[in-house]
A protein has these predicted regions:
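Short, cationic low-complexity segments
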Residues: 179-190
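Conserved catalytic-core motifs of GNAT/GCN5-like acyltransferases
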Residues: 67-70, 119-121, 127, 136, ...
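Acetyl-CoA-dependent GNAT
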Residues: 34-90, 101-102, 107, 111, ...
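Active-site acidic-Proline motif in GNAT/NAT acetyltransferases
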Residues: 85-90, 94, 122-124
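A short beta-loop-alpha structural element at the N-terminal edge
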Residues: 3-15
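Conserved GNAT acetyl-CoA-binding A-motif
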Residues: 108-134
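A structural signal for short, well-ordered beta-strand segments
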Residues: 83, 116-118, 166
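Conserved GNAT-fold acetyl-CoA-binding loop/helix
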Residues: 16-43
Length: 190
């Protein structure tokens, strides 16, 4: 069974090694080029200052990761977060993603995040060589529902891709307490 822990900047090379093939060979990421290691570390620093970034490990190796980041960087949206997950190809379909997302949701709930959003590419044709329905199906199995559909919004590999926003509510919508940054939650501060 994989174990989970918070990511550190020392994990950046292993995490980038998981992410880069998604950029280079799929339309799962709409980036055209993988970020440099320095840029990836900078992204991680920005996330870890506010949100959790989790890694799953098994037998001493990182199997995948999941993190949250601002849904929209405006004060009124602070109780919403966008979530992202990437797994090593050989770890998909083995419960690693479910484990990561379940813990990520628990931590985000402790931050008083109420709604989670995932931006997911959708193939326009069956048997697309660069994009499948794996991510939309995974998110549906995790309780996400479609909140928005944007046709022809991503162009990669000489073809157009649709994009959906998926939403999952993890908290009530009464007047929320103040948003808490992840380092405070992790330290057990109220």
């Amino acid at each position: 069974m994989p174990t989970l822990r918070s990511a550190t900047l020392l994990d950046a090379p292993a995490l980038l090694a998981i992410y880069a093939p998604y950029v280079e060979g799929t339309a799962i990421s709409f980036e055209y080029e993988p970020p440099t290691l320095e840029d990836f570390r900078t992204r991680m620093e920005g996330v870890l200052a506010v949100y959790p970034w989790l890694v799953a490990e098994g037998e001493g190796e990182i199997l995948g990761y999941a993190y949250a980041h601002p849904f929209i960087p405006r004060k009124a949206y602070e109780h919403c977060a966008e979530v992202t997950i990437y797994l090593r190809r050989d770890c998909r379909g083995k419960g690693v993603g479910r484990l990561l997302y379940t813990e990520l949701e628990r931590l985000l709930s402790a931050q008083d995040v109420r709604d989670l959003y995932a931006c997911v590419g959708v193939p326009r044709v069956e048997n697309d060589p660069y994009l499948t329905m794996t991510s939309p199906n995974f998110h549906a199995a995790m309780g996400y529902v479609q909140a928005g559909y944007f046709p022809n919004s991503g162009y990669k590999f000489d073809r157009w891709y649709d994009m959906v926003w998926l939403r999952k509510s993890i908290g009530g919508h009464d007047t929320p307490p103040a948003f808490r940054v992840y380092p405070d939650v992790a330290a057990g501060e109220d």
